[in-house]
Each structure stands twice: as structure tokens, then as C-alpha cells.
Amino acid sequence: RDITSWPARPDLLPVLASSLSAAIIWNIFTRRMGVPTSSTHALVGGILGGVIAGGGMQYISWGSPKMIYKASGVWRVLLSLFLSPFAGFLAGLLLFKFFAFLLQSVSTRANKYLNGMEWVLVPMLAFGHGANETQKAMGVIMLALCAAGLSQGAEIPLWVRTISALAVASGILSVAPLIVRRVGGIYKQRPLHGFISQLSSASIVLFASITGGPLSTSQVVASSIVGVGSAERIKGVHWQVARDIVRAWFLTIPAVAVFAWLLHMLLFRHLNLFL
């Protein structure tokens, strides 16, 4: 809701329709291509493009970037999105250095315990991912309900929470093999690498969920793997794969914004759908 200052009235519904349509189509396309892009970036880009097409720049709450911890509006969202991968990289790099030093005299039997820790860290990461993603889903649903006059926005109904949780859970279950292989191909990992990347990713995602900072879990995981790989052997990192992923991250917001703008102009301005 920080992105737009559009009043909660019916003419917001076409804006949301074009915004979400653009984001969904982009996500389906990149998923088919096996590119691990960010659904959060797509949603932000879609809302920006839809709002600009529907009402103009004056309805964008740009906010202020003066102080990171006091940033507001679009700047707050963008700072969270683009700083979180750097946090993942640094956490992966520093934690690997620390644990590699700590475990240097430990035998390979420690791998069994590191693998066992995955049973704790993976659920932590999944919980943080779900908590972060469902907040965005609920925000969009509540915007639509308020615009349609079906809610005052004072409290999020249980059915909205339930639908959002089920949607995110079903999305996690529908694994995209190409994306899994792409992220896994950044660096050849052993138990210590997996432990560090999961620990750093879970910590950052949980912190962002608690503080209300939107981020992309896939970004954080991928950047933490790059950090872990760089800490051990920088030449072992498949930088071409990492570069392709980063390009997709930076391309998503402007590409989806333009797509949402075009959709809105075509469907709601020229064809007058739902108006």
C-alpha cells in the first residue's frame, strides 16, 4: 500500500487488474524459461505501471530515501528489494569464513551434523518466505476489497489470510526444475556450503518478515550461494549464471511496469473493459 496513494474507490480495480495480470504473465514466462526472477519485483513493477497508466505519476507515493531506516513509499520498497541480495552475499561470505575457521580441525564426520541442521534451517527459511510473501498477497487482496467497498481495511479477514497462505504454499510445492538447477549451478556445494547459505538466507528473510521489509527469497538464496562460493574459491563461482540472474532482477521492475502500462491502456482505455 506504500507504493500508491490512490484512494480506495472502484476505479482502482482496473489498475489492480492490469498490474496483477502483467506480473502473473511475466512470472509464468520467466518460470518457463527457467530464470529465477522475483515475484515481488514483478508485483512492484506491475503496480507502478498500472497506477501511472490509470491515473498518472501523482498517485505514486515515492517517499524519501534520505535515511535507510526511515525511508518511505516506493523508496522504502526498492531499498529493501535491492539491499537484501547484498546482505545475503555478505552474510554468506562472512559466515563461511567464520565456520571454515571454526571447523578446520574437525573431521568429515561433521558433515552428518551439518546435513542434520538442514531439517531445522529449511523449515525456518520456508516459514520466513511464507510470512513475507503472504503479507504482499494479503495487501493486494485488501486493496481490491477496499476499492470495491467490501472492506474498510481495519482488520484482515480470516478467509483472506487462509487463501493467501494456501496460494503461497501451493506455489512452493509446484517446483520449477529449471530454476532449481539454475540456482544450484551457481556453485558446487558441499554440506558446509548448504548449511551456511541456508543459515544466512533464513536469518535475513525472517528478519525482513518481522520488520515488514519486502524482499525476494530467491534473490537472497542465490546471493548467499555466491557469497559462500566467493569466500572459498572465487573462480569456482559460475559467474555467467550469476550475471544472468542479476540481469533478470534488474530488468523485472521496468519490464513489468511497461507491460502493465500497455495492458491498462489497451484493455481499459481503448477497449473499455469493466468500465
Can you say where each PLM-predicted feature lies in the sequence?
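Multi-pass alpha-helical transmembrane bundle typical of ion/small-solute transporters
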Residues: 1-275
